[in-house]
């Protein structure tokens, strides 16, 4: 995922996903307590899905571009400042310009993790998945445990998408595999993660699922919480595992969000199939828990919109008064009181 400079280090607090063990269960039932159990095990996940966390306005990124251009005129080799510029360009959809900034940084310092990681992210958005894979592999070779070990989940997501687009694209991974296994790897990100971890059948272990959630939720927080690819990947992780330890209600909503954001009918058919499979885990499609979840999601979305409006108003004020909008944002919105996204033990 793209590198956040030290001045924005507070994001690491917001994006932390804590792990703990899960009690073993022997039965498989769903009742009115299911949603409460899911929310207890995955507190904060609905807020991420609904966008209820502090995020910058487009005006902030325009300000940052102007500001870093001025500062870089004085310090053209300041790589951290170049990261700020590139990420701001990326956030405004100017990915080719962001890539150019990082290529210039690469010429200054060829083996810098942050530069390679940024390139791995930006090239995803230009559709060049093979290049993204190469950049991410280079970044991981320098720092295998970057972002608390989350970087590899972005690499695996890129590989999963490459296989989905073309099942022959990664022969070094798929050679010798049965066609049915390759199809599973193409259709479900959680299955691909398990395979890359050396497991080709059964449920995803809880520690593995928690680590994968760290990766996907981190990408949603840092990059784009409304990205349908990330939402589908989140649904795959939430739905996987022991039926009494997964979160099929939340998976249902993640899949539904992804389906609505995708534009192509074949993709929608795949998401409808995943929603149907998630639905099969509870007693009725009209289960009270699902209705409660949808209401909770609407509340998270409304809170997120209100928060985004407040942040934008503050940032416009800071910019107009000549203040450092980045520093002011961090002081006001990324303090120790910010809630974390956690992954707790089942009761």
Label each residue range with its predicted role:
Residues 157-177, 275-307:
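Alpha-helical linker/edge segments of TPR/alpha-solenoid repeat scaffolds
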Residues 76, 110, 144-146, 225, ...:
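Short coil turns that delineate tetratricopeptide repeat
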Residues 53-66, 90-99, 202-214:
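Helix-turn-helix repeat elements of alpha-solenoid scaffolds
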Residues 25-78:
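N-terminal leader/linker segments that initiate helical-solenoid repeat arrays
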């Amino acid at each position: 995922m793209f590198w956040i400079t030290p001045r924005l280090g507070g994001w690491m607090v917001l994006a932390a996903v804590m792990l703990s063990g899960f009690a073993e269960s022997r039965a498989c039932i769903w009742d009115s307590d299911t949603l409460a159990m899911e929310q207890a095990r995955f507190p904060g996940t609905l807020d991420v899905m609904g966008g209820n966390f502090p995020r910058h306005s487009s005006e902030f990124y325009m300000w940052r571009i102007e500001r870093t251009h001025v500062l870089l005129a004085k310090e053209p080799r300041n790589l951290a400042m170049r990261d700020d510029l590139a990420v701001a360009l990326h956030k405004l959809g100017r990915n080719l310009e962001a890539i150019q900034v990082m290529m210039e940084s690469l010429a200054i310092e060829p083996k810098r993790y942050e530069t390679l990681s940024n390139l791995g992210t930006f090239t995803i958005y230009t559709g060049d998945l093979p290049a993204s894979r190469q950049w991410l592999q280079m970044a991981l070779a320098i720092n295998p445990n970057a972002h608390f070990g989350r970087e590899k989940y972005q690499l695996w997501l890129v590989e999963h998408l490459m296989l989905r687009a073309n099942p022959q694209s990664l022969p070094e991974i798929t050679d010798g595999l049965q066609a049915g296994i390759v199809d599973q790897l193409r259709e479900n990100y959680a299955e691909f993660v398990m395979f890359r971890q050396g497991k080709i059948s059964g449920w995803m272990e809880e520690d593995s699922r928690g680590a994968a959630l760290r990766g996907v939720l981190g990408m949603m927080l840092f990059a784009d919480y409304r990205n349908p690819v990330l939402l589908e990947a989140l649904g795959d992780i939430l739905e996987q595992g022991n039926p009494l330890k997964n979160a099929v209600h939340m998976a249902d909503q993640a899949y539904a969000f992804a389906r609505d954001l995708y534009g192509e009918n074949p993709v929608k058919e795949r998401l409808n199939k995943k929603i149907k499979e998630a639905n099969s885990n509870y007693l009725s499609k009209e289960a009270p828990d699902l209705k409660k979840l949808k209401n909770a999601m609407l509340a998270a979305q409304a809170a997120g919109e209100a928060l985004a409006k407040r942040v934008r108003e503050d940032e416009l004020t800071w910019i107009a008064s000549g203040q450092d909008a980045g520093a002011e944002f961090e002081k006001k919105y990324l303090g120790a009181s910010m809630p974390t996204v956690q992954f707790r033990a089942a009761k």
